[in-house]
Amino acid sequence: MSSAGDSGPGYVLNDFDAVPRGTRGRRPGLVKDSLLDLVKVQKGSYNSFTPNNESNERLEAIFHTIFPISDPLHRATIEFLNCRVDDLKYSESECIKRGITFSAQVIASIRLVIMQDGVSLEKYQEIKEYDDHSKLATVIKSAEEQEVRFCELPMMTDKGTFIINGVEKVIVSQMHRSPGVFFDSDKGKTYNSGKLIYSARVIPYRGSWLDIEFDVKDHLYFRIDRKRKLPISVLLKALGLSNNDILNKFMKNRVYKHKSGWKVPFFPDKFKGVRLPFDLKNVEGNVLLKANVRITSKLAKNLYDNGLKEYLIPYDSICGLFLAEDLIDSASSTKILSAGESIKLEDIKKLELLSIDKISVLNIDNVSVGPYILNTLFLDENMSYENALYEIYKVLRPGEVPVLKIVEEFFRNLFFSPEYYDLSNIGRLKLNSCLGLNYEENLTTLTHEDIIEIIRKIVLLRDGQGSVDDDIDHLANRRVRSVGEFIENQFRTGLLKLGRAVVDSMSTSSLDKVSPSDFINPKVLTNVLRDFFNSSQLSQFMDQTNPLSEITHKRRLSALGPGGLTRERAGFEVRDVHPTHYGRICPIETPEQNIAYNSLAIYARINKYGFIESPYRKVVNKVVTDQIEYLSAIDEGLYYIADTSAKLDENNCFVDDMLYCRYAGTFVMVNSNQVSYIDLSPKQVISVAASLIPFLENDDANRALMGSNMQRQAVPLLKPTAPLVATGMESFVASGSGAVVLAKRGGIVDSSDSNSIVIRAFDKGGINYLDVDIYHLRKFQRSNHNTCINQKPLVHVGDCVKEGDVIADGPAINNGELALGQNLLVAFMSWQGYNFEDSIIISSEVVKKDLFTSIHIEEFECVVHDTPLGSEKITRAIPGVNEENLYHLDDSGIVKVGTRVGPGYILVGKVTPRHSLSLPPETKLLMTIFGEKSFDCVDSSLYTSPDIEGIVIDVQVFTRRGEEENERAFLIKQKEANDFEKERDHIINVINQYFYDELRKILINSGSQDRESINFIEREGWWDIGLKNQSISKQVESLKKDFDEKVSHAITNFKRKVEKLHEGYDLPQGVSMSVKVFIAVKHSLQPGDKMAGRHGNKGVISRVVPVEDMPYLEDGTPIDIILNPLGVPSRMNVGQMLETHVGWACKKLGEKVGNILDEINKIKRAFCEAIRSLSDDDFEKFAALYLDNKKFEDINDDEITASILDTPNKDELNNELTTLVENYFNSCKDAHSSLRHFLIEVYSCGSNLSICNNIRDINDNHLIEFAYKLRDGIPVTAPVFEGPKDEQIVKLFELAGLDNSGQVVLYDGCSGEKFDRKVTVGYMYMLKLHHLVDGKIHARSVGPYSLVTQQPLGGKSHFGGQRFGEMECWALQAYGAAYTLQEMLTVKSDDINGRVKIYESVIKGDSNFECGIPESFNVMIKELRSLCFNVDLNAK
């Protein structure tokens, strides 16, 4: 962003508030910002479901599946017309504050049509279909249209989250098996023989699963919904196929003819390698080949070419064959043999007697074709169509009496009814692709042909034809269900429930004087949606620790949830990396446990079918184009894809003729002419969190996993600082996370303060005024994880902003870049044993500067209930509490904002009425004597917990509608109303300023008024002047109309906000008031806190060492943090060393820039001193020439130095003054040139051509301004997989004047002596994680006990004790500490009588105690008795 008046060459560098980063990457970036919409997976899916301005097809399609609804007697029907989503009533911030759901009402227009008596519903539908209005009137008794509220639909926020009951939640996308058919085998693991058992499974999107499988005997079975298996012939006969049909569909036939013997066609291909057990004779009976001679393919071809078309076959070779169709005697029309029946010798003779000269047999050779279908058919060859249906019904509905009509309808609904079965369009596509079918995509049910083709394919697999290539972990077989699909399914489920409720209501209601809304209960659908958002495993409490954790949570993929896996079944295969994950799912950011979570890769997107796609650049004739295409895992396997390491010339052509490419899941070397695509970017493989780790390629994958996970645990700091060594993704993460404020439209900043930013918005051309945009900043708000959300403005009044610019930073954001930690001076060395085992030593200076101080917001709530004895009351008059403990409460009894509170402070004073019978006698006596009423109630105030110490930053008071507000609630509302009023006035002022300026220009340009006279006229009168002038009246009238509309809109918005403010709150039943108190707790760094780097290098602070005791450099600079060098080689995360080196160089380069700036400042100070020491005459000459004749006392040093823009004119100044100015000018010019040259040399170490050009072009003033931003270090980027090589790092060291080893001499801060050898020192980016010692340390003396075992509870949340476990007992046994062990296992654990006695002993001052029987022993005895073992403990 730039100032409104900026111009000249300085604009480019000053277009950022953050310092431009010099990239140390090996190639310039090629990725467009539009590809980095990091929450598109959430917003895109939800927006495709919810209605928008263009269409609402998906929502209306769900309504059309339920409607029309008719009553059982067909007296009336309810028809759906259209639907819409109403406007939002409350904003996101109001919903969070009120604790309600951010939702909008779904309103549908429906029509209730009541039929005339005796008119059937079918007749009405028929007339309606033909659109015959004249006949419709004769069949309709009445028809009423009405808009009906159906439900409250939770709406997605701009950040891709939902606000449910005031809490931000995320719907995690789910990976599950794609609908379709999958073939598999057991890989020979089921049986010891190693025989392959093949199976097929049809998985629908909605409906029953169909499994088809072989058994060990090669019989083919099927299952429905994993119930008991049945022979496949039962399913086929239920489809209406006969035995003949079954055999003809799945088996080929051979025809045997009888004429002077049985003849068979001769096919050469079938005889390759065959030995016939009989002599091969032609039809004339000539022997062509003796028995048992092996027939080669050449011999078979020669026989065929020599005229052998048919050959004679002996009787014994026909015996045992199976008929392919029924044999019917044509004379008597009787069945001789049935299809599938085996032919015997007597059958052949019988056929000859009946003069049957042709038979068709099944072509089964038990080698290439097996008798699987035939054998399965023999299991139930006499089963009929009806019996087959009954068998299936009995398996799925055991115990119910089958009725044919019901059974037929039931079987049809299983697979062939769209109402109960849905393959989805992707399921149909996969079925078509796998089975070679050509059905339309919108046919989403199974067909008979589908089932037949599935059976045919599994039989071919068993015959050895084809292979099982369905890898269930292949991303072609796994799809993603996102939030829009989940809500669509829930909406459909809720509407089905609603439809059933409507039918029940219509059947029991009289249809006289009813309207459509009488039958629609909106709670039914609302409850279904509410249950999903509240209780679904995929509706999760958003991880809001920092912006990165938010964005990672939204991009997470889960295999758990409804329709997915369970934690127990999420094995290694599910979590393992698959070749198809490349560019789609991150191989690094995977779960460390069996929780089956993954993260989307950076540039991955999800297509309309739910498959993950990755972008690639198109390659045409060896030329890499800028055309970007997305490929799914299915498409990717068809092309040769090169990676980004392929060398390109200046024309983007491949340099090498042979390239390594990915193809079908493997790496192959191919000619560059065959390459179709190339990777878009090296980092497209990894996720957002992993892309923030510099030098990731130098880290072990396990440590990189820890690094990406720990960045999500980093606590936002009070003073966030962007990393010196970044990866270039920080700004994308910041802007995509929703933590920053982005400009919705371009414009000019009208005002900017800590609470809001006001921008006058213009169109994209910057010409036409649109409106006033007000951005309210979030100030010290509590996140889901109690971290602090605080936004700070980046823009100033008069700045020009563009659409999408970052105008305010958020938590853990610094100048629009993600800033999770601090850059610290680190030394890798051991120091007095305090950094043993990854422990970390921190300088006290780090704590003193609050570098790692974080603010956490704790929320406390006090609820006022209605009790049987009366309502509780918030008051300052609390019985039994001294006045000195109430000084921080206001008159209403609520703590004041800004109060510093500690453990045990009263936050809200509250008393609860109690019955007088419960008062002790002495209290009743005091009440009688003194007339005290305070004894009628008990103190139930809200106190701070023991571990809280901070400042009250906000108080919110919620009063139920209709209840009387207390004074504090009134003051809070009054303050908010005043804020709304100020906002309204500010908007109107901005509108007035713009429109009156425009009107002024029109009047002056038209000649109606001149510049002087118009100032003496009231502004409101300008409109009349313009309207009276006919030449500009239309223009003024249009301007006046826009002005009135915008002012009216601002006033209307103000009134609406005030009305909502005074309407009260919806509180739970029995609650009249609720008070929330927010306390800001400051956590400084202390021993026990966990810290980490970005490379998986983590540790706990062991000691905060005084700065004077820390090791220091030769120039006296103390080290900030000491890490153990042994933590590097064993963890193999060398990236942290490279980051340390580059950070060290960046810091030293910044110091060099600072030295040059100091030299320039020194020159300027000397010149200013010389000017101020001039004589009066000389100063007057100088002031006349350079300072506009200003007086000596009216100028400052900056004005003096800024005035010298060129060498002086010798004629106007004396020689001494001319020499002084010339020397200053030349000295500054040389210093500026030196600075410019140095910066160009620094930035030329990478792909920074644009920055180098800008440095050359900008003027000296902008150069100095730019250089001042680099004094603390020159920030650089090391893109993932494209980090700087060793030569570049060495060059940086040379520029910075550092030793190439990266090691320096250190001195001991305690003794001042030099350490024995040089130490690796540099700057590393360190994070403070949310594992704070304040949340871990816990102590207990007495507390709650378990009811069963009477042992102390465990954990800080239960105020539990420290468990003395099994291994601790072994330790005491090893030392022979019998009495200590007895004490631990009895009186200090669960010996009830013993711990009472030891308490009494302590009171009496007696050190003796007795141990009894622990309660756990009694529990064991009772458990044994439950197993019928009577165990008694008898004393001797």
UniProtKB/Swiss-Prot annotation:
Keywords: DNA-directed RNA polymerase, Nucleotidyltransferase, Transcription, Transferase. GO terms for biological process: DNA-templated transcription. Pfam families: RNA_pol_Rpb2_1, RNA_pol_Rpb2_2, RNA_pol_Rpb2_3, RNA_pol_Rpb2_45, RNA_pol_Rpb2_6, RNA_pol_Rpb2_7. It comes from the Bacteria. The RNAP catalytic core consists of 2 alpha, 1 beta, 1 beta' and 1 omega subunit. When a sigma factor is associated with the core the holoenzyme is formed, which can initiate transcription. Belongs to the RNA polymerase beta chain family. This is DNA-directed RNA polymerase subunit beta. It comes from Wolbachia pipientis. The gene is rpoB.
